[in-house]
Amino acid sequence: MRPHDAQLGSGGGILFSQTDNLNPSTKRLSDHARRAFTLVEMLIVIAIIGILAALILPALSSAKLKAKQIQCVNNLKQMDLASMMYMHDFQGKCLPYDITGKGLLWMGKLIDYHGEVQTVRLCPVATEIDETSTNEFRWGTADRAWSWHSTDPQKDWSGSYCFNGWLYSNLTNRSGNMPEEDAVNLFMGESTIEHPSETPVFGDSVWVDCWPKMEDPPAADLYHGTHGGGFNGKIGRLTIPRHGGFIAAKAPRSFDMDQPLPGAISIACFDGHVELSKLDNLWNFYWHRNWVPGARPN
């Protein structure tokens, strides 16, 4: 026994320290136990981090979608204001349908009214165009912007919103005038709009404009929306779940029409306000002069 391992008792006897009872193998076991406990602690910490990540990441994703939705609303407010300023300058007449000449359409007419800021036409969810397409006119999708070609190389437009075609002050395309049975639905200026807070001017869409009709069903493909030329721009151009907590890239390509439509879009109305509208609610707006709000047709 080493001298420093012993102590004197009260009666002068020698007391042995506790270390005398621990042989080398016992010490190794004790050290191993301490190491094992440390590993268990580390595994518990890792598990807790995983649980916290599972709770926090969806919240962060939701917050990001919400931020994009707010920016979209701000964009549409600026577009709506630009449209109102144009009408004020042209004695209450809405934007003309201009695809001849330089093909400015509404984008070229309004550019000066929103400070020539091109990005105001782009919803943050859909800013990129389809670069794989070689067409001069490229359709958008739930998460991509459309592209409109002009004869002026400096005036190629892109955007994520459509203009309500029933508001155009003159409707003549390369094939001629709008058919008479449809022309009766046109708003003939500011004085003919009886429900300004429920009459859309702009909305999230896969194309530059639209002419919804009461009998229009939603698009079966909620990612690409409904296509169609001329004045045949159905409401399906707008039935894309771009907002409302929905991830636009995951929009169904083949939707069961018996189910409620998912998601929502932003709508700018004639009175200047912008609202988030569920897709199923789109038939409750006054898209044209003779519209009767009702349930969604299938």
Please report, for each region that a protein language model flagged, where it lies by residue.
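N-terminal leader/signal peptides at the extreme start of proteins
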Residues: M1-L39
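Intrinsic disorder/low-complexity segments
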Residues: Q7, R34, A54, D143-W146, ...
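Generic cytosolic/nucleocytoplasmic N-terminal low-complexity/intrinsically disordered segments
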Residues: D20-L22, T26, A63, F163, ...
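Short helix-capping and inter-helix turn/linker motifs at the boundaries of alpha-helical repeat units
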Residues: S30, P58, D98-G101
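Amphipathic alpha-helical segments typified by the pilin-like N-terminal helix
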Residues: R34-N74
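Short, well-structured segments within or immediately adjacent to enzyme catalytic domains
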Residues: I70-N298
